[in-house]
Amino acid sequence: MQGQVQGQGSASQWQSGSPRPMQLRVRHTTGFTYAEGAEASYNEARMTPLTTSDQVVLRSRVEVSPTAWSQEYRDYWGTVVTAFEVHEPHDALTVVATSTVESTPHAVDVAPVEWADLAAVADEWCEFLVLDPWVRPHDDLGAQLDALQASSDTPGEYAVGVFGLVHDHLRYLPGVTQVSTTAAEAWEAGAGVCQDVAHATLGALRRAGIPARYVSGYLHPSAEPVVGETVEGESHAWVEYWDGDWRGFDPTNAVVPGDRHVLVARGRGYGDCPPLRGIYSTPGASELFVSVEVTRLR
């Protein structure tokens, strides 16, 4: 999905969700089919939303077919992980995660920081400052980012400029990139999906010394969700950046994340929070399938 960036200024000026709590049910179905069957598979699912100060998980469950041994734990980044193993021959693996969450937009009461203030948090948030190949900006973007930083009085002002720059350049177009595509490759293509837009945004922020992290989750596609109506939702990605507090922004849609966004995982990039990852034993090929259904309950 894409929106229209509404000029310059503070990110808080851009659209966010309503102040009323919204309750959403998310049903995420994913898995693999195996052309010649699999003898066994070992997997991790990151499909359970997090409870935070802005989001409460009321109910959640993860179901695996064929029936599998499983355990739940939290990884280094605080994400809920369901690890499971299937030790019998199977032609397909299906994972269904169903969750009900209630959320409100994140309220930031802390004053924005100055450029000089970033040094004080560089050690604490050093992992979110790394310019690895996944997020490193394209070489052609360097001069633009240098000019933007030089003209920005504060990190927050620079961040707003980055959001507009990335949103204007990267067209949302599925099929142009792959899960392994880097931010620089997507930038050169001029198009990609939410993962690519988030990675490009992270790289531009980190290059200026602003801690920034990748966020994965779900998005209800309607600006005004109808209570009781089930719609095709989206696995989605956005960013959070440090400006006195962690502030979120969805650069694909040019909005501040609100009550239509359901947060599942945070990390340095997509590689820290893939919905489903694992290994399997088969002589043939496999094919991934995914569907997301979202229902507003109230």
Residue spans of the language-model regions?
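Glycine-centered loop/turn motifs
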Residues: 98, 138, 152, 228-229
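Ser/Thr-centric signal marking residues that sit
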Residues: 30, 177, 252
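Short intrinsically disordered coil segments
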Residues: 45-47, 62, 110-120, 253-256, ...
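Structural beta-strand/beta-sheet cores of well-ordered domains, especially the beta-sheet scaffolds
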Residues: 22, 28, 43, 60, ...
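Structured loops at beta-to-helix junctions and adjacent beta-edge loops in soluble globular domains
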Residues: 48-50, 65, 98-100, 242, ...
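Hydrophobic/aromatic-rich core segments of domains that either
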Residues: 11, 16, 164, 196-286
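Secondary-structure boundary elements
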Residues: 109-111, 117-192, 200, 208, ...
